[in-house]
Amino acid sequence: MATAAASAREQLREDERPGEPLHASFYARPVLEVARELVGCVVEHDGASGVIVETEAYHESEPACHAFVGLTERTRPLFGDPGRAYVYRSYGIHAMLNAVCDEQGVGAAVLIRALEPLTGVERMRARRGMADAAESELCSGPGKLAQALAIELDRNECDLREGPVVIRARPRAWSEPQILVSERVGITKASELPWRFSAAGNAHVSSPRPRALPS
């Protein structure tokens, strides 16, 4: 599959091609920094990829984060090595992809909320069962993007540098995205925190659309 992914990247314009997989040191920083800087990076898995256009930060200090309850079997990955995936199922239905951040022993992660499809779009359509849908509908939410990329719970704790889920550095076309900062959505606790980061004006972000000034 790595060969197929490399072949797909070669078909892109030079300024669309993502950089190298992000090193663990990228993630070993405060979660708010990582959440902002992941916007514009590229997620690859199983023959498809997309540019991250929306993220949310979660930290053990606030009650919307799974790590708020402390170390349990479920939350153990959140306290582990930065740069690994934390994948869980929401409401028993949708897989959610997160990148573990901060120092080992600190429970923090970035939820990948939306992607702009880059390669493997027809695979995404088939996986979503949406043959005629607009591209902007394919990955405009965390459950949608996991389904489009065929990410399931068996990817929990995978190394995001080595794969099979890989996050790569921003393509040149995304070197300096304009970022909107707004409140997190879809949660009932600590929803007032401005920990949602999205690419300004991008059609692929999730609903409700962020309403904030660039910062």
Name the predicted role of every residue range.
Residues 2-215:
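Conserved, well-structured core segments that form or line functional sites
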